[in-house]
Amino acid sequence: MQIQETVPLDAPEHCPGPSSENAGTASACEGCPNQQICASAPRGEDPDLPLVVERLKEIKHKILVLSGKGGVGKSTFSSQLAWGLSLEEDKQIGLMDVDICGPSIPRIMGVEKEEAHQSSKGWSPIYVCPNLAVMSIGFLLPSEDSSVIWRGPKKNGLIKQFIKDVNWENLDYLIVDTPPGTSDEHLSLVQFFKNSGIDGAVVVTTPQEVALQDVRKEIDFCRKASIPILGLVENMSGFVCPSCKGKSNIFTITTGGGEALAKEMGLPFLGKIPLDPLIARSCDFGKSFIDECPESPASEIIIDIINKIDESLQKRQ
């Protein structure tokens, strides 16, 4: 299995990448042995872009899952969204993990020991059930503890490979789990998805203002990049006692939480998912929480959010 190199191994730390408009001319290029090669290379649109767009157009629905801050449960929500959509056995679901420096999807989906293999049709994603396929850099690393220390152009190259070289097999839904914030991975996704009919993004937050202030930036990014926002999800919204069913707020809500922010920004509010220790347990063991704990209040709310997203997408057709 080969990851295509887009940045020379002897390039300086802040190399803009050989396909960049600044290749060979940026200040970071001074003293690089490849400077003349990059400076004289032809400029223009990425030659792979038409193929990438064509592959994406074959997928009926494409959803980005975003968060402004790390640790709000974005990957957990991405996994439950994929599990929930896969309950319709006639639908094909793909889950693509582009959190390249911190891939957690393999563990959450229970396939952390698997390796991706190549066939005549391209890379084969890992199937967690007959209609749910997963792809992550975690399947390409020598061990779970291996770090990924990459510049932006190399991340861009891998995301491109995940789209054009993975045999996704006629997907109905592609869920893309992204890193927190607005990083190189997000810019690559915008470049690849903007001409392929992306359905939109689901933004995940927790109730406290320190998370909400970063979500405002994420919403601003989506609007500047012309990415529709399907709605806002408030995660870790209180704790429901499994014995008495009483609810306690873990995070102090000082500015109204996710629901108030959605109203302020003119966005659909999809729901509040309470804390449930069994969610973390399900993720650690690679199980579907909504299958393992169908009577949990959190499970019922997750299913309701998934139904809202699905209904919204069906209305857009």
UniProtKB/Swiss-Prot annotation:
Entry superkingdom: Eukaryota
List of residues binding ATP: G68, K69, G70, G71, V72, G73, K74, S75
Cofactor note: Binds 4 [4Fe-4S] clusters per heterotetramer. Contains two stable clusters in the N-termini of nbp35 and two labile, bridging clusters between subunits of the nbp35-cfd1 heterotetramer.
Gene Ontology terms describing biological process: [4Fe-4S] cluster assembly; iron-sulfur cluster assembly
Family per similarity comment: Belongs to the Mrp/NBP35 ATP-binding proteins family. NUBP1/NBP35 subfamily.
Biological role: Component of the cytosolic iron-sulfur (Fe/S) protein assembly (CIA) machinery. Required for maturation of extramitochondrial Fe-S proteins. The nbp35-cfd1 heterotetramer forms a Fe-S scaffold complex, mediating the de novo assembly of an Fe-S cluster and its transfer to target apoproteins.
Protein name according to UniProt: Cytosolic Fe-S cluster assembly factor nbp35
Source taxonomy: Eukaryota, Fungi, Dikarya, Ascomycota, Taphrinomycotina
